[in-house]
């Protein structure tokens, strides 16, 4: 007497006829307009919560400074590992010149935008 595996395998001893009915308490979310509008509102609220605020200008400038220092650090490593035996003072001066050139390049690109 089971219907697709639902219900009793045998009505014997259950005090019922074993007839399987559709559950009227079940509601299909796709067909019920009351539930779909509520679900859409919840999705919109979740999307609004996931939107990230605009970044602060200080954070952006800090990241730019870190990128510049990374380039200068790589340049310093290249000078220190190079075949020329340069003193620390000359390496420092070359790194300062390189840093200035990068900063001037960034300022020129900002002024063009």
UniProtKB/Swiss-Prot annotation:
UniProt cross-references to Gene3D superfamilies, sorted A to Z: 6.10.140.420
Biased composition (Low complexity): 43-52
Subcellular location: Cytoplasm; Nucleus
Descriptive protein name: Pre-mRNA-splicing factor CWC21
Keywords: Cytoplasm, mRNA processing, mRNA splicing, Nucleus, Spliceosome
Compositionally biased tracts (Basic and acidic residues): 29-42
Annotated GO biological process: mRNA processing; RNA splicing
Presence of the UniProt keyword Cytoplasm in the record: yes
Signal peptide positions (record): none
Start-end of Polar residues biased regions: 11-26
One GO term describing the cellular component: spliceosomal complex
Region (Disordered): 1-61
Function of the protein: Involved in pre-mRNA splicing. May function at or prior to the first catalytic step of splicing at the catalytic center of the spliceosome. May do so by stabilizing the catalytic center or the position of the RNA substrate.
Domain CWF21, residue spans: 60-105
Subunit structure: Associates with the NTC complex (or PRP19-associated complex). The NTC complex associates with the spliceosome after the release of the U1 and U4 snRNAs and forms the CWC spliceosome subcomplex reminiscent of a late-stage spliceosome.
Record-stated family: Belongs to the CWC21 family.
């Amino acid at each position: 007497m089971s219907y697709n595996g639902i219900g009793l395998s045998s009505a014997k001893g259950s005090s019922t006829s074993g007839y399987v009915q559709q559950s009227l308490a079940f509601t299909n979310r796709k067909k019920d307009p009351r539930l779909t509008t509520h679900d859409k509102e919840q999705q919109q609220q979740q999307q609004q919560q996931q939107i990230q605020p605009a970044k602060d200008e200080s954070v952006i400038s800090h990241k730019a400074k870190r990128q510049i220092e990374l380039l200068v650090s790589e340049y310093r490593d290249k000078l220190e590992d190079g075949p020329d035996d340069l003193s620390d003072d000359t390496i420092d001066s070359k790194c300062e010149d390189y840093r200035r050139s990068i900063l001037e390049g960034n300022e020129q690109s900002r002024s063009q935008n």
